[in-house]
């Protein structure tokens, strides 16, 4: 997040995009909110490194096109072609919406730079969309991981909290919390940047990363138990690859931005040009998450693939979902239990591999 030294931008230095420091204008001596600095970072980068700015804008253009197509298709399938709105589907729909928001905010970034430089109102949609997407994406990725853990490892005890109404309440809380955090950060003009950076980094990034890492490890341990049948090996491998891919994408997309926040807070004398370049590269990596989420959570699942093939007139055999497997287990045993682990390794692996259908 951007900051400059107390001397202000007139000192000839490019502002650091870090968490929070006091910024004063030469004319009035008033503190400037961080949002005012975010709105002008493109001008700073273009004036210092025009080639890099053009390259990053080309990448953002590709992200916009790919994200619009993938997320638009995902939103249509999950909202219009998926009848069972399970908790996983609800979390995935909200994740797709956040990715669409950041994609739709990118054209505003081009328009602001070329046609409305210095217009804070014009820059607001992009700045708000970016930070809201980052906060919501982290939280919804965490929700999806926790939901997969409950469905696979704790299906019996989590039956009550894995209801659609509960998932909708969680999503509403995520949107409100992310919006409040985003607006408060953009309006910050105070001091004590180190304390705020560490607090935000722990709450926004390290805590969700810890939850995702621990629950991913627990799920992989459950999938790796010796009793798995041979015919379930292919689905088990696919499920493990999905979990690792989710964790890797989370690290690649969100770690650089938060690591840079902490680095600038601990090293306030970091060269301004270095800080500016690292900030823009980290923002680009974070935006890349908006067109990678549909690939991980939608196209990897067999149910989504079958629906997309049906839309394009290509019919293929669809694997039974985890709900089908559990229902078959109930009818054969007659016990009325939903415990996926007791339904066998094949059902356990499908519960993860079918993702939003479970």
Curated annotation (Swiss-Prot):
Ubiquitous with highest levels in intestinal tissues. In the brain detected in thalamus, putamen, and caudate, but not in frontal cortex, pons and hypothalamus. Belongs to the G-protein coupled receptor 1 family. Residues 315-339 are annotated as: Disordered. One of its GO terms (molecular function) is G protein-coupled receptor activity. Orphan receptor with constitutive G(i) signaling activity that activate cyclic AMP. InterPro entries: GPCR_Rhodpsn, GPCR_Rhodpsn_7TM. Its main location: membrane. Glycans are attached at residues 16, 26. GO terms for biological process: G protein-coupled receptor signaling pathway. Coiled coil: none annotated. This is G-protein coupled receptor 20. GO terms for cellular component: plasma membrane; receptor complex. It holds the Pfam family 7tm_1. It is found in: Cell membrane. Residues 70-86, 147-168, 218-238, 297-358 are cytoplasmic. CDD domains: 7tmA_GPR20. It comes from Homo sapiens. It is a multi-pass membrane protein. PANTHER family: G-PROTEIN COUPLED RECEPTOR, G-PROTEIN COUPLED RECEPTOR 20. Residues 330-339 have a biased composition (Basic residues). The keyword Electron transport does not apply. Residues 1-48, 108-125, 190-196, 260-275 are extracellular. Keywords: Cell membrane, G-protein coupled receptor, Glycoprotein, Membrane, Receptor, Transducer, Transmembrane, Transmembrane helix.
């Amino acid at each position: 997040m951007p900051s400059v030294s107390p001397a202000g931008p007139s000192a000839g230095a490019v502002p650091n995009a870090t968490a929070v420091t006091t910024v004063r204008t030469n004319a009035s001596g008033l503190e400037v909110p961080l949002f005012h600095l975010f709105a002008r970072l493109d001008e700073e980068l273009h004036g210092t490194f025009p080639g890099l700015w053009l390259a990053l804008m080309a990448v953002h253009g590709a992200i916009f096109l790919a994200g619009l197509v993938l997320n638009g298709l995902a939103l249509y399938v999950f909202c219009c072609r998926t009848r069972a709105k399970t908790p996983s589907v609800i979390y995935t729909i909200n994740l797709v919406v956040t990715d669409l928001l950041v994609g739709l905010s990118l054209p505003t970034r081009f328009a602001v730079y070329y046609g409305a430089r210095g217009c804070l109102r014009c820059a607001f949609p992009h700045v708000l969309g970016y930070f809201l997407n980052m906060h919501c994406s982290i939280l919804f990725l965490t929700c999806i991981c926790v939901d997969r853990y409950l469905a696979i490892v704790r299906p019996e005890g989590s039956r009550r909290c894995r209801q659609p109404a509960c998932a909708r309440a969680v999503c509403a809380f995520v949107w409100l919390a992310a919006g409040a955090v985003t607006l408060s950060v953009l309006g910050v003009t105070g001091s004590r940047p180190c304390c705020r950076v560490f607090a935000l980094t722990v709450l926004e990034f390290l805590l969700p990363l810890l939850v995702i890492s621990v629950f991913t490890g627990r799920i992989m341990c459950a999938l790796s138990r010796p009793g798995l049948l041979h015919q379930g090996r292919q689905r088990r491998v696919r499920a493990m690859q999905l979990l690792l891919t989710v964790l890797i994408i989370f690290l690649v997309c969100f770690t650089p931005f938060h690591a840079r926040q902490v680095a600038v807070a601990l090293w306030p004398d970091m060269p301004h040009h270095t800080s500016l370049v690292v900030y823009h590269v980290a923002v680009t990596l974070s935006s890349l998450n908006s067109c990678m989420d549909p690939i991980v959570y939608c196209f990897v699942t067999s149910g989504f693939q079958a629906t997309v093939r049906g839309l394009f007139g290509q019919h293929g055999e669809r694997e039974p979902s985890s709900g089908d497997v559990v229902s078959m287990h109930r009818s054969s045993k007659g016990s009325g239990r939903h415990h996926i682990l007791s339904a066998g390794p094949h059902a356990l692996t499908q519960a993860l591999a079918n993702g939003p259908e479970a």
